[in-house]
Amino acid sequence: ERERRIKAARGQILDANGKVLADNKTVCTISVIHSQIKDPEKIIEVLSRELDMEPDAIRKRVEKVSSIEKIKTNVEKSTGDVIRNYGLEGVKVDEDYRRYYPYGSLASKVLGFTGADNQGIIGLEVKYEEILQGTSGKILTTTDARGVEIDQLGEKREQPVPGKNLKTSLDVDLQEFAQQAAMKVMEEKQAKRVSILLMNPQNGEIYACVNVPEFDLNDPFTLNTEENTGTLSEKQRQDLLNQMWRNPCLNDTYEPGSTFKIITMAAGLEEGVVSVNDRFYCPGYKLVDDRRIHCARRTGHGSQDFIQGAMNSCNPVFIEVGLRLGVDNYYKYFQQFGLLKKTGVDLPGEAGTIMHKKENMGNVELATVAFGQSFQITPIQLAATVSSLINGGRRITPHFGVSVLEADGSSGIKLEYPAEEGIISEETSKTVRQILEKVVAEGSGRNAKIQGIAVGGKTATSQTLPRSANRYISSFLGFMPAENPQVLGLCIIHDPQGVYYGGTIAAPVIRSIFENILSAKNKNLWVD
């Protein structure tokens, strides 16, 4: 018996509204069976013409004595049909599937793509491989001793079982809008790259995850750079491809800067070492163990209460809260908030937090961590942690996969994710929301203000290392409605040129996305 595999159709990946993000295209595999060939010259002539191949390459395979020789895979179906219609003995045209991405580069670093064998390589394609892959079928044909098929015995078929479909929380319209917004700010600010995350802070569903520049999923082995890549070695090329495929929202860490003051604020309020009415004085710096740590405003903010300190994003205020907490307590909240373990997002290669060891953390380290410097976290970790601090204190798992559907689209299994209740009290969570609403209404985040709806948020501008290079990461984290958040957005701009303040360049990006959500009346994201 001779066996030929029939590939199973891979399951589709769908967005929240059922739009197809990853699909299959029928392609053909052309093979020759040596023992059945009657007119080799005709076969060589037809195949070289139709497949646009060198006759010699085909001759080698046609003349090779073997049970079956593949000539070409991934042949367009129309070409396969033409070849089949010649009725050439010894030529087999088998139909097969190739992955196809209708939206090109949309959410490329989330969806991922498949290799030549149709197996997932990165992204959701590899994370949900077992669900999507299906089971191959086979064709068994009976042959005589010379390997010639005995026609009258026919063939036995085991039909392939198609893969199941994965429904995700991604929203194509939101993803497209956010990707355009990211491209726009990247071009305007001549930035190196821009990431945007949009998620539901109540349940962890991710609506959009943008990392520009993205790449074309239908052509994932072509670099997305303008530079001439002709002179690269194979290793350099592979390194650049790996870099292009990375998802910086979870594969890479960064120094968050002032968006991290939300964590210090929540810990200080929960522990009771600070209240909203506490007064602080900022002369433009704070002395910690004989070291002068500056405020962004060198002339100082003068006298202010805690809410004003947050509105001004004043470093000395948050250093003071960090020092009042002390290393042991600060570390306790770090653990309690889930910052020292990974978020568990359903994509491969999530990076962990890079933090000072507790025993190496002195007052100076504590002071810098309190306002978001001297350590690194992933954007997804920041978004998930802040979500958990503003939703009433429930630690959620950020995720894309929502349910697994049968290939015919029928019944599905809902995917479940862990959540941990009570990482802070409802009361502290409410105070954090109120303070962050003030930051947008009257403080450093006012460029995210929207008429008619309360938005909460926090800006950040951090210098990358070495500090002397004067390169910055500008970001803004916002959520709405402030009193009962249904959507949280994080925009991170790497290495912007010119004006680099997060409140000036990143806050308007989140505002434009929030306005887009509000204007799309058919979307009920923001109303519970």
Region annotations inferred by a language model:
Residues I68, D151-M199:
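Conserved, well-ordered alpha-helix/loop/beta-strand core segments that scaffold catalytic motifs
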Residues V46-E54, R61, V82-G90, D94, ...:
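Structured segments of extracytoplasmic/periplasmic soluble domains
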